[in-house]
């Protein structure tokens, strides 16, 4: 009896295999397209579980966060901030913007002054960031940033964007980053935010600077792979579309409530 059941199973499997081979032989292109489409759908489900598609912004957005924002630089060119601030879709609006101010020794973003002024005038919380160059003195970079950015009450703390280490060792990079952070904190009275990609963070920065707020870039994940990092902001996409901005733009979420965001801006420490 068991032998007959086993034989039937083998026969059924063989017939299914022959049927599949026949379909592939008769409809090769359609079969390939079917399996490719299925694979894409499975991959999307894994990567975007917990996301919801938002048509106007042209991306999927993490569903469990309520505070959304963008970051911009000269690559977005001339921005219509009034249109940015007015945009709404599916209950989502943009509430903050991080704006590139400076880079390295002497580069000032040509659109910074305009973006800095108009983002605030149109009701967005604003933050300014410096792109760190490992080949330039940390103090020189900090002075450039502080000379360029005129902070006001209600602005985010300064941001240091750390994405490369050049010829430096990880230890030497951290030393220079620390110099920049301390110099800017002393001048502004607030601990700067550190921005970095998840992979670069794991390789060079993990376990250090835990007293600073973090902004991590990690795309197409349910949550950023933080390796114990207490992140405040998450850059989850670089392909968003926003009214008033030409081309793609980075999208971010704040990890917290509206009240926590306000406390963060005001510099109020959370109680345990």
Swiss-Prot record:
SMART domains in alphabetical order: Glyco_25
GO molecular function: lysozyme activity
The organism's place on the tree of life at top rank: Bacteria
Active site: 71, 163
Keyword Cell division: no
UniProt entry tagged with the keyword Isomerase: no
Entries under Pfam families matching the protein: Glyco_hydro_25 (PF01183)
Keywords: Glycosidase, Hydrolase
Gene Ontology terms: biological process: carbohydrate catabolic process; cell wall macromolecule catabolic process; peptidoglycan catabolic process
Protein name: Uncharacterized protein YegX
């Amino acid at each position: 009896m068991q032998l007959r059941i086993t034989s039937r199973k083998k026969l059924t499997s063989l017939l299914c295999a022959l049927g599949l081979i026949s379909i592939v032989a008769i409809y090769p292109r359609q079969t390939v397209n079917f399996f490719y489409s299925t694979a894409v759908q499975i991959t999307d489900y894994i990567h975007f579980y917990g996301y919801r598609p938002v048509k106007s912004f042209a991306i999927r957005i993490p569903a469990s966060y309520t505070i959304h924002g963008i970051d911009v630089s000269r690559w977005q060119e001339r921005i219509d901030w009034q249109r940015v601030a007015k945009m709404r879709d599916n209950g989502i609006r943009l509430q903050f913007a991080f704006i590139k101010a400076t880079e390295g020794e002497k580069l000032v973003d040509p659109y910074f002054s305009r973006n800095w002024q108009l983002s605030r005038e149109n009701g967005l919380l604003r933050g300014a960031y410096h792109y760190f160059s490992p080949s330039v003195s940390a103090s020189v970079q900090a002075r450039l940033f502080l000379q360029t950015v005129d902070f006001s009450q209600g602005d985010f703390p300064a941001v240091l964007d750390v994405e490369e280490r050049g010829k430096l060792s990880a230890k030497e990079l951290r030393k220079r980053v620390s110099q920049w952070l301390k110099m800017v904190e002393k001048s502004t009275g607030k601990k700067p935010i550190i921005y970095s990609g998840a992979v670069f963070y794991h390789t060079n920065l993990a376990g250090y600077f835990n007293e600073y707020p973090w902004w991590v870039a990690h795309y197409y994940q349910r949550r950023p792979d933080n390796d114990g990092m207490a992140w405040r902001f998450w850059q989850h996409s670089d392909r968003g579309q926003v009214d008033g901005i030409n081309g793609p733009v980075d999208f971010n979420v704040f990890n917290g409530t509206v009240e926590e965001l306000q406390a963060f801006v005001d510099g109020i420490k959370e109680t345990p």
